[in-house]
């Protein structure tokens, strides 16, 4: 025991021996309680101050001992400490019993009110390691496994076609993309790191696309909206139409105009073709080619234009009417009466039937009436009052309505491998035509209508489906003024749908399933 410790014990013993009899005397005397309590409080305060001074002296000695000790001594944390006395000293149990002196590894522990350093000082917390995607170089004939997120956008777009369950883009993910093999002379990790692929103009925020759009439709829409333009090809069409060759083709999945797929770029006034494509899919007709709206950098005006997928499987048309089947209005009315190829019946030669199935004319008439497309069945504009800007007026065809039976139909197109069904092209519609000027000549001779389309028109879900479908095409949605502008177009279609239902009921036309 050191000298300061002995001195502290002597002082404690002396104070207790002097104060004890005086405290008893004060307690038993007849002094006022207020004065007695004051004396007791003063004595306790003096003794408490003495104890605090002793503890402070011990803390000072502990600080000096810590500074003199070795900093890297790790054995001090292995000594068990059963209790901490108030006088600041600490000794192992065996040294307290036999009175032996402390060993040099004495530890002093004091309570501090505030930490001078943070709990986790620098160097004690293991930092998080960032992921590194470096890929080692390989030999020319070797292969490297690369995660899909590290593949360059050009390589990823080309490889996506090999995965049938995946829809390319950020917004829809039908299935998990597997690992793929990359072939090449050298594959370096720095070249594979891409921060983020560009966002697609076809936006799908739900888990899947609308049910009326197939996976192939979505794939082709993304190709038209996001595919790089490789070159511009000459076309036989008039009106400033251009044929664009697109990159990112997939072998066998998209009909192309050669080794790469192509898109037919039209004028801004033909934007209604995008609306026509979505309406065709919602009605269950599936006769139009995929169409999207797009802005191109090489066009200076910056206005969005419709781009329609070019299908090389269509029967070429070199005549003036741009049709694979040359047919007049009079012949068309005779075909409607003969009901060619209905119920698998082979027509007789004297009927003059074409290879087109009878139900195809009903689908075309319904579709053209809703959009008021006159350039197929009424090229001379004989069923309504045309305007000066209409093609029939500009071409001087309006006076030819006296002999309508000889008027040739236009844009009647088939596929080479499927001549029974029609393909609707040049679907420029008109939304500004008033209800008292609708072209009912388009419905002349039609006695049956497709059940799938009529059921959608009668339901209350046509507006909801059109909004949901047109929202996918971001460029078209914004070009029409957002939802407010799209709602106005849908209002026109809904009014025409009610008029068509009234026409069907008034003329006793039948509604039949046409899913042959």
Swiss-Prot record:
Assigned GO CC terms: Golgi apparatus; Golgi membrane
Keyword Ligase applies: no
Membrane topology: Single-pass type II membrane protein
InterPro entries in the record: FAM198
One Pfam family recorded for the sequence: FAM198
Residue ranges, Cytoplasmic side: 1-37
TM stretches of this protein: 38-55
Glycan-linked positions: 286
Subcellular location: Golgi apparatus membrane
Record bears the keyword Transmembrane: yes
Keywords for the protein's UniProt record, in alphabetical order: Glycoprotein, Golgi apparatus, Membrane, Signal-anchor, Transmembrane, Transmembrane helix
Top-rank taxon: Eukaryota
Family (UniProt): Belongs to the GASK family.
Protein name as catalogued: Golgi-associated kinase 1B
Chain's gene name: Gask1b
């Amino acid at each position: 025991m050191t000298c300061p410790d002995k001195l502290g014990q002597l002082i404690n013993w002396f104070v207790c021996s002097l104060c004890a009899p005086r405290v008893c005397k004060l307690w038993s005397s007849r002094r006022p309680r207020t004065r007695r309590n004051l004396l007791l409080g003063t004595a306790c305060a003096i003794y408490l101050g003495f104890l605090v001074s002793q503890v402070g002296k011990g803390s000072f000695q502990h600080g000096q001992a810590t500074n003199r000790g070795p900093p890297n001594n790790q054995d001090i944390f292995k000594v068990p400490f059963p209790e901490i006395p108030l006088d600041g000293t600490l000794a192992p149990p065996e040294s307290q019993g036999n009175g032996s002196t402390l060993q040099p590894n004495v530890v002093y522990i004091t309570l501090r009110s505030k930490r001078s350093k943070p709990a986790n000082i620098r160097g004690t917390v293991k930092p998080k390691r960032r992921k590194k995607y470096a890929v080692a170089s390989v030999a020319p004939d070797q292969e490297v496994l690369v995660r899909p997120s590290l593949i360059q956008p050009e390589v990823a777009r080309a490889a996506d076609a090999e995965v049938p369950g995946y829809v390319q883009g950020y917004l829809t993910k039908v299935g998990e993309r597997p690992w793929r093999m990359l072939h090449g002379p050298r594959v370096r990790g720095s070249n594979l790191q891409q921060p983020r692929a560009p966002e697609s103009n076809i936006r799908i925020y739900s888990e899947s696309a609308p049910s009326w759009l197939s996976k192939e439709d979505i794939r082709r829409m993304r190709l038209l909206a996001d595919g790089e333009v490789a070159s511009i090809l000459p076309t036989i069409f008039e009106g400033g139409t251009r044929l664009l060759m697109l990159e990112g083709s997939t072998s066998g999945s998209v009909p192309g105009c050669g080794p790469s797929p192509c898109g037919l770029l039209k004028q801004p006034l033909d934007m209604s073709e995008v609306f026509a494509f979505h309406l065709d899919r919602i009605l269950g007709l599936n006769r139009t080619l995929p169409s999207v709206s797009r802005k191109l950098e090489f066009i200076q005006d910056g206005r969005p234009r419709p781009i329609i997928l070019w299908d090389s499987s269509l029967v070429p048309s070199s005549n003036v009417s741009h049709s694979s089947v040359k047919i007049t209005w009079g012949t068309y009315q005779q075909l409607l009466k003969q009901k060619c190829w209905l119920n698998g019946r082979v027509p007789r030669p004297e009927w003059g039937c074409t290879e087109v199935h009878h139900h195809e004319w009903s689908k075309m008439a319904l579709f053209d009436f809703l959009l008021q497309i006159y350039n197929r069945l009424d090229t001379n504009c004989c069923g309504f009052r045309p305007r000066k800007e209409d093609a029939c007026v500009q071409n001087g065809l309006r006076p030819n309505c006296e002999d309508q039976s000889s008027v040739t139909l236009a844009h009647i197109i088939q596929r080479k491998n499927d001549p029974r069904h029609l393909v609707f092209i040049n679907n420029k519609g008109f939304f500004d035509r008033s209800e008292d000027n609708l072209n009912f000549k388009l419905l002349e001779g039609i006695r049956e209508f497709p059940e799938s389309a009529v059921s959608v028109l009668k339901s209350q879900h046509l507006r909801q489906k059109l909004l949901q479908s047109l929202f996918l095409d971001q460029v078209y949605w914004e070009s029409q003024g957002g939802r407010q502008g799209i709602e106005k177009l849908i209002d026109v279609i809904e009014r025409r749908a009610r008029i068509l239902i009234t026409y069907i009921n008034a003329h006793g036309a039948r509604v039949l399933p046409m899913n042959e």
